[in-house]
């Protein structure tokens, strides 16, 4: 690869179930706006456009937003930017429905402007199309599972949007694995479009997604777009933690408080980063990209230099030893039945998951086997 080539210009297929091609990083647009600034920090329209311009110039084409981000500012600004740059068809645009996107209009009865049902879905999509100044959405997510809509209603209503041309692909976020598997099986059984990508919280300090969501994605042929991969500002060097303590994280996110757990994982990331001569956050980003195939981290920033600081992570290769060092920063418990299958629940030592035939202890008692390995993540190109 030429050293002058844009950092994000080696594209990848989104998932085995979706042929669309996207940049290796997805730009998160929840940071774009001034509404809810006390919780999420502020990013002006001028700065948002500068970030978008840089991302696009580096080859980035995958952008994520939602109907309710920043009281609609995120979608509106994205629409204005694409219209002014005349590049809508270059962009793979993802948005979401389920949030109460008109909550700032206090005079309205809100009950059907949010939720996962058909009316909320159609109203939200039409509003998003208007704000985004486009006739179609590349990827529509169900933002979260609210236990109200039936699987048949959901999948038929979503498929109607695909058939209408308003939506090209379907995704789901922040939902249990059993819901996604059940919905996809229903879709396949009835000739409907299935979910092709999952979005959820995942980073080196928060690995819950690995229990059931990640194995489900691999089995369902789904891609994975993790958010929070940089721990929402809580991965830092010791100097960075001192700065945060002094400023009380002024201007940044203040959703989840900093913990000693964040500090301990950060220390290990810093050790790996120092040994490789790269910034800590690049290692944190490279970690999730090399854990599984079809992983496209969502990175949200409020300044251009925040983005330039992490983009080189797409070319960082971590050794198995470095990945193990990061994961040994704390004890992750996959829980039952995974520890039963691996046999670790019966033994002294750390808990381990059983996600492939080579680690199922009952099987290993029967003989010596050679197994076909599963799909591997793309190795970074230097």
Swiss-Prot record:
Q: Which residues form the signal peptide?
A: none
For the biological process aspect of GO, one term held by this record is: aflatoxin biosynthetic process
Identify the catalytic residues.
Answer: 69
Example GO molecular function term?
A: oxidoreductase activity
User: Which biological pathway?
Assistant: Mycotoxin biosynthesis; aflatoxin biosynthesis
**Which SUPFAM superfamilies does the UniProt record give?**
NAD(P)-linked oxidoreductase
The EC number of this protein is 1.1.1.-
- What does the entry list as the binding residues for NADP(+)? 64, 173-174, 199, 228-238, 302-310
Where does the source fall among the domains of life?
Eukaryota
**What keywords were assigned to this record?**
NADP, Oxidoreductase
Respond yes or no to whether keyword NADP is given for this record.
yes
Give the Pfam families listed for this entry: Aldo_ket_red
List residues binding substrate. Answer: 143
Q: Where is this site: Lowers pKa of active site Tyr?
A: 96
Q: Which PANTHER family match?
A: NADH-SPECIFIC METHYLGLYOXAL REDUCTASE-RELATED (PTHR43364), NADP-DEPENDENT OXIDOREDUCTASE DOMAIN-CONTAINING PROTEIN-RELATED (PTHR43364:SF7)
What role does it play? Norsolorinic acid reductase; part of the gene cluster that mediates the biosynthesis of aflatoxins, a group of polyketide-derived furanocoumarins, and part of the most toxic and carcinogenic compounds among the known mycotoxins. The four major aflatoxins produced by A.parasiticus are aflatoxin B1 (AFB1), aflatoxin B2 (AFB2), aflatoxin G1 (AFG1) and aflatoxin G2 (AFG2). Within the aflatoxin pathway, the norsolorinic acid reductase aflE may play a role in the conversion of norsolorinic acid (NOR) to averantin (AVN).
Similarity comment: Belongs to the aldo/keto reductase family. Aldo/keto reductase 2 subfamily.
What is the protein name for this chain? Norsolorinic acid reductase B
The primary gene name is: aflF
């Amino acid at each position: 690869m030429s050293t002058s080539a844009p950092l994000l210009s080696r594209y990848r297929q989104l998932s085995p179930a979706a042929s669309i091609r996207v940049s290796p990083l997805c730009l998160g647009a929840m940071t774009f706006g001034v509404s809810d600034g006390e919780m999420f920090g502020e990013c002006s329209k001028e700065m948002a456009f500068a970030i978008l311009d840089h991302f696009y110039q580096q080859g980035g084409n995958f952008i994520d937003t939602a109907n309710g981000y920043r009281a609609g500012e995120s979608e509106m600004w994205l629409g204005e930017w694409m219209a002014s740059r005349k590049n809508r068809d270059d962009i793979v645009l993802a948005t979401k429905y389920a949030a109460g996107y008109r909550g700032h209009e206090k005079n309205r009865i809100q009950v059907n402007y949010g939720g996962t049902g058909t009316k909320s879905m159609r109203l939200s999509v039409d509003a998003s199309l208007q704000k985004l100044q486009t006739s179609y959405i590349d990827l529509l997510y169900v933002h979260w599972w609210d236990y109200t809509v039936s699987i048949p209603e959901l999948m038929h209503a979503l498929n109607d949007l695909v058939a209408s041309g308003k939506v090209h692909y379907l995704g789901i976020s922040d939902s249990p694995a059993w819901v996604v598997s059940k919905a996809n099986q229903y879709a396949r059984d009835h000739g409907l479009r299935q979910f092709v990508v999952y979005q959820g919280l995942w980073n080196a300090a928060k690995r819950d997604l690995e229990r059931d969501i990640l194995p489900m994605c691999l089995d369902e042929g789904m891609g994975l777009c993790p958010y929070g991969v940089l721990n929402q500002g809580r991965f830092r060097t010791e100097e960075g933690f001192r700065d945060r303590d002094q400023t009380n994280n002024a201007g940044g996110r203040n959703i989840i408080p900093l913990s000693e757990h964040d500090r301990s994982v950060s220390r290990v990331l810093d050790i790996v980063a120092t040994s490789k001569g790269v910034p800590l956050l690049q290692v944190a980003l490279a970690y999730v990209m090399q854990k599984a195939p079809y992983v496209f981290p969502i990175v949200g920033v409020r300044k251009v230099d925040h983005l330039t600081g992490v983009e080189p992570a797409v070319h960082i290769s971590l050794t198995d030893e470095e990945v193990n060092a990061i994961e040994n920063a704390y004890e992750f418990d996959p829980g039952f039945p995974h520890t039963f299958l691996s046999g670790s629940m019966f033994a002294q030592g750390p808990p381990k998951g059983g996600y492939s035939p080579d680690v199922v202890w009952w099987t290993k008692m029967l003989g010596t086997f050679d197994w076909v390995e599963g799909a591997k993540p793309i190795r970074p190109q230097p």
